[in-house]
């Protein structure tokens, strides 16, 4: 698995997987995409972007900010999953938030390889 493929597996869900409401979305998607795994600590947070992978690849052609990250030109629909209670031992319980934010990524060879965060404007 390349770093770009790992980025897609951990962060891109387009179109958004249907039939999973609220917090259940995070638990199911993190397990399904093997972001969380049995016997391993829970990841404190993870963001899924509900936009085509090509849109995130295009972000790598935009100028980087002072810290080297590239931001999407327009806000995207995302689901932000955050661990409830801070206990990293399974079972992992997440809180889900639907947001419309710009996405910040780091790129390698023109492809996004790390989701650095999101911001409202």
Curated annotation (Swiss-Prot):
Task performed by this protein: Pyrimidine-specific nuclease with preference for C.
Superkingdom classification of source: Eukaryota
Protein name: Ribonuclease CL2
SUPFAM superfamilies attached to this UniProt entry: RNase A-like
Family statement drawn from the similarity comment of this UniProt entry: Belongs to the pancreatic ribonuclease family.
GO biological process, one term: defense response to Gram-positive bacterium
Binding residues for substrate: 6, 9, 43-47, 82
GO cellular component: extracellular region
Gene3D superfamilies referenced in this protein's UniProt entry, alphabetically: Ribonuclease A-like domain
Enzyme class (EC, first level): hydrolase
Main location: secreted
Residue numbers annotated as active site: 11 (proton acceptor), 114 (proton donor)
The organism's taxonomic lineage, starting at the top: Eukaryota, Metazoa, Chordata, Craniata, Vertebrata
Disulfide pattern: 26-81, 42-92, 60-107
